[in-house]
C-alpha cells in the first residue's frame, strides 16, 4: 500500500484529508524545506510541491508570482528533487509534485519518474496532461511506484470523469471553479451540485476538492461531498506577506504558517504574527 493510500485509510470518521501546496524555491530556496516541515507539523495529510514553470496556465496570480520568484532564484527541476530529498530526511508525509508536462518531457518521462521516486516523491499532478494522452506517463509512473492524479472541473463531461477515475491513482482532484487557482468560491453558486454529481462518477479513487479555499469554514463547506480538500493560493499569499514583512523573525514566520495549516485542518484560531524582539 502506498503512503498516500495509508494516509486516506488512517483518517478518522468524518475527517477530511488536507493537502497543502507550496512552490519550490518560494519565497526563496532556503525557506522551502522549513516551510514544508511547518505545514507538516500543522497537520497536512499530504503536501503538493510546485515545480516552478514559466507559463503556469491553470494558476492565479499568487502562484504565478511564486513560480516567477522561484525561477528568478534559478530553481530547476533537479533542485526540486533535491528539496524533496531534504524533506524526506525528517518526514514520511506523502508528497506529490505538481507542475506542467513540458519540463517533464524535456527531462525524459521515465528518467523523471525514476528520479522523482528515488528522491521520495509519492505522486504527480500535471494539470495540462489530458488523460487520453497519458499512456507514457501512466506507464512510467506505475513502473516507479508513483501515483498519477488527474483533474476534473465543473464543465467536465460525465464520460470524461469516468475516464479520469479509471486513469487516476491516488485521488481525483476536483477543481471547484472553471478558472484559475485562488478564484472566489462565491462566483460559483452551483459548486455543491457539481461535487455531488462528481461523487456519483468517481468510484475507484478518493475525491478531493481545491481552488478557492481560504479558511477552515470554506474547507468544511466545500468538502462535504468529497474525501478532502487542497489549499494553495491562500497559503502562498500568507507566506508572501510574512516574508515581505521585515518585522517578522524567521521563527515567527514559520510558527504562523504552521498555525494557519492547523486552522485549515481543525478550525483553531489563526495565529497573530509577532514582530522581531527589539
Curated annotation (Swiss-Prot):
GO molecular function: tryptophan synthase activity
InterPro entries per record: Aldolase_TIM, RibuloseP-bd_barrel, Trp_synthase_alpha_AS, Trp_synthase_suA
Residue positions of the active site: 48 (proton acceptor), 59 (proton acceptor)
UniProt entry keywords in alphabetical sequence: Amino-acid biosynthesis, Aromatic amino acid biosynthesis, Lyase, Tryptophan biosynthesis
Signal in keyword set: no
Family membership: Belongs to the TrpA family.
Protein name: Tryptophan synthase alpha chain
Organism this protein belongs to: Salinibacter ruber (strain DSM 13855 / M31)
Amino acid at each position: 500500500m502506498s503512503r498516500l493510500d495509508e494516509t486516506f485509510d488512517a483518517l478518522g470518521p468524518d475527517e477530511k484529508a488536507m493537502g497543502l501546496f507550496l512552490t519550490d524555491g518560494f519565497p526563496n530556496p532556503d525557506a522551502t524545506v522549513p516551510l514544508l516541515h511547518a505545514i507538516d507539523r500543522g497537520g497536512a495529510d499530504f503536501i503538493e510541491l510546485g515545480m516552478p514553470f514559466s507559463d503556469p496556465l491553470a494558476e492565479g496570480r499568487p502562484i504565478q508570482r511564486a513560480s516567477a520568484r522561484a525561477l528568478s532564484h534559478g530553481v530547476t527541476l533537479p533542485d526540486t528533487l533535491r528539496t524533496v530529498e531534504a524533506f524526506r530526511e525528517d518526514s514520511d508525509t506523502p508528497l506529490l509534485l505538481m507542475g506542467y508536462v513540458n519540463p517533464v518531457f524535456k527531462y525524459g518521462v521515465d528518467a523523471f519518474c525514476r528520479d522523482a521516486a528515488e528522491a521520495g516523491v509519492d505522486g504527480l499532478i500535471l494539470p495540462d496532461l489530458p488523460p487520453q494522452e497519458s499512456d507514457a506517463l501512466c506507464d512510467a509512473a506505475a513502473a516507479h511506484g508513483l501515483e498519477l492524479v488527474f483533474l476534473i472541473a465543473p464543465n467536465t463531461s460525465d464520460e470524461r470523469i469516468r475516464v479520469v477515475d479509471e486513469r487516476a491513482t491516488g485521488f481525483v482532484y476536483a477543481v471547484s471553479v472553471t478558472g484559475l487557482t485562488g478564484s472566489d468560491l462565491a462566483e460559483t453558486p452551483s459548486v455543491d451540485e457539481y461535487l455531488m454529481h462528481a461523487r456519483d462518477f468517481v468510484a475507484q479513487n478518493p475525491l478531493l476538492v481545491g481552488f478557492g479555499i481560504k479558511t477552515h469554514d470554506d474547507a468544511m463547506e466545500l468538502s462535504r461531498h468529497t474525501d478532502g480538500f487542497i489549499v494553495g493560493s491562500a497559503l502562498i499569499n500568507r507566506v508572501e506577506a510574512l516574508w515581505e514583512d521585515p518585522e517578522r523573525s524567521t521563527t515567527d514566520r514559520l510558527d504562523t504558517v504552521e498555525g494557519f495549516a492547523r486552522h485549515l485542518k481543525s478550525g483553531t484560531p489563526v495565529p497573530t504574527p509577532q514582530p522581531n524582539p527589539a
